[in-house]
Amino acid sequence: MRKTKIVCTMGPSTDKPGILRQLMENGMNVARFNFSHGDYEEHKGRYDKVRALSKELDLPIACMLDTKGPEIRLGEFKNGVEKLTTGQKFTLTSRSVEGTNEICSVTYKELPHDVKPGGRIMLDDGLIELHIDEVGDTDIVCTVCNDGIIKTKKGVNVPGVHLSMPYMSQRDTSDILFGVEQGFDLISASFARNAQDIMDIRHILDEHNSKIRIIAKIENQEGIDNIDEILTVADGIMVARGDMGVEIDFAEIPAIQKHLIDRAMSAGKICITATQMLDSMIVNPRPTRAEITDVANAIYDGTGAVMLSGETAAGKYPVEALKAMATIAETTEADSSFDSLVHHSGTDNSRLNISAAVGHAACTTATDIGASAIITASKSGETARLLSRFRPDTQIIAYVLDETTRCQLNVYRGVTPLLMDYATSTDELISMSVAKAKSAGLVQDGDLVVVTAGVPVGISGTTNMIKVHMVGDSLLAGVGIGSHNAKGEVCVCRNAAEAAKKFKPGQILVVPFTTNDMLPFMREAAGIITEEAGTNSHSAIVGLTLDKAVIVGATNATRTLKDGMTISMDCVRGVVQAMAK
């Protein structure tokens, strides 16, 4: 099961009949709504479709509002587009003018007071570079450094300059309030520079009693420099490489990406890697080799999620792009070296609180015993977030009480969130959660699972219990020899002669006791169960020598177990359980 989550941006391509359904059915985890484009009516229409379809398919698709942020854009050009030539003069002004190939207005009126001669200004994601020659009260006179076509409303970046513009605009405030009203799960805060920027958004959410999670988009040098303070107040970060690649020397981006992902992992926070991951698939049905490697390397770096932007919003092949990204993620995670490359303590070498320590122990236990799943149930979903930070190889099945928490958890690496009714006791919680995981096809009879929760049940922030549990009902109990587990079909034999007639290699041999004439069958058995007790018995000694799963002292085993039954053997616990065929 893929653990890396995938974010898909909504747009005209996802509006086409059947596309949204295909995205959900093929692994989309988060729907991103880019508020730099479109109006409220357009966003609400798409939002309602996502919610309705995710309810129909019973999928916890999280909805993420991506703010416009404190960006600077060009004004209107008279002809909509102009050509700039290397060496020519071009003026940016805070005055309201009609744009030509000599002058254009900018949306940020204080820009002339923030820049100095000798600096650089980048237009349209860095496609055109301007050198600042002179700065006046309203005008910035520049020299064009390379030929290019410039269009109305294109972006303006000023590398290495602290802009005095306020973080929260009236537009962003209105957009966030719209998100609160609609019920969005996540907000990605564009151009986050420091902790205060995130707190400004948090203040608005708190005023409206909203539990929306905040993802800080790191897009400039200030955000990189202040990453640790941002992570203390944000729920996660997005490594937004688009504007970052304009603001910062492009050669530094790979190292910065690794650094940001590492800091997010250390803080135990969400990390999404974004921008141009499969950019060629906007027009082509297959990714380039470089793009495949880019996605894989982000996953090797430890990112919890990867994002598609124009590929799904406006591309010709949105479903193919999603499938390609999912395949790359699954293949990368299946690499034998993957676990060692992404292993991370998630603690940043600091002392853990009780809940985090229990979560860490649950992950370690699951790895040590080869558990099929870590199952957790919590009201707030915090336990699942704690488990995700430790990057276990085992899937995390998280039970929560409400749909909002379920959707918010769907952006966390390795977490499969499900709804469950309130449990009144620990025993009820374990039985309900294991039964639901089994009915969902996530575990099966005979699987070992690690269950972690809080005792007493129902109190948030009290994760303090771990239980190793085997799925299914116990048929027999005895003494396990060694630490192996086994699964297979039963063959009940009273003696070697009967075994010679009906035993097949790979079956579990069930006998009153063993003797030397049974050695050929014991060698080919998946496991051995005997009624005879004793760790020094023939079956125990031979089983250890052959490195087989053996349970001795299983009273009435030859009468309780029947030929053809499918069972599991847990030698650590000395338990035999029935399994569905």
Where do the model's predicted regions map?
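Structural preference for beta-strand elements that scaffold enzyme active sites
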Residues: 5-7, 30-32, 60-64, 89, ...
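Conserved, mostly hydrophobic/aromatic
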Residues: 9, 34, 66, 118, ...
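Short beta-alpha connecting loops at secondary-structure transitions
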Residues: 244-246, 277-291, 305-316, 342-347, ...
